[in-house]
Amino acid sequence: MAHKKGTGSTRNGRDSNSKRLGVKAYGGESVTAGSILIRQRGTSVLPGVNVGQGKDDTLFALTDGVVKFETIRRGLRNRKRINVATAAG
């Protein structure tokens, strides 16, 4: 017979690293071309004027300017769009 109690096993104990998603540049902030504006999974926020979209749905600035958010009506639900407004002239 065993003289020690056997140790149990568990099916827990795993966790993934955080992906640091979210808004990186807020409305009114000045950004340079190539700056990451939003890291996201899927298109929660749509790219607007002077904003590009990476293959992982990251939104980034195409030109220097100021970040502007807007809400647009698309179908039955409202969507957010992010633009980069350049300085005129």
From Swiss-Prot:
Domain of life assignment: Bacteria
* Pfam families named among the record's database cross-references: Ribosomal_L27 (PF01016)
Q: From which organism does this entry originate? A: Synechococcus sp. (strain WH7803)
- Please give the positions of the paired cysteines in each disulfide bond: none
Q: Name one GO molecular function term.
A: structural constituent of ribosome
User: Which InterPro entries does this chain map to?
Assistant: Ribosomal_bL27 (IPR001684), Ribosomal_bL27_CS (IPR018261)
**Spans annotated as Disordered:** 1-24
Q: Which family does it belong to?
A: Belongs to the bacterial ribosomal protein bL27 family.
Q: By its UniProt entry, which Gene3D superfamilies does this protein fall under?
A: 2.40.50.100
Give any single GO term for biological process: translation
* Protein known as: Large ribosomal subunit protein bL27
| A cellular-component GO term for this protein | cytosolic large ribosomal subunit
Q: Which controlled-vocabulary keywords does the entry list?
A: Ribonucleoprotein, Ribosomal protein
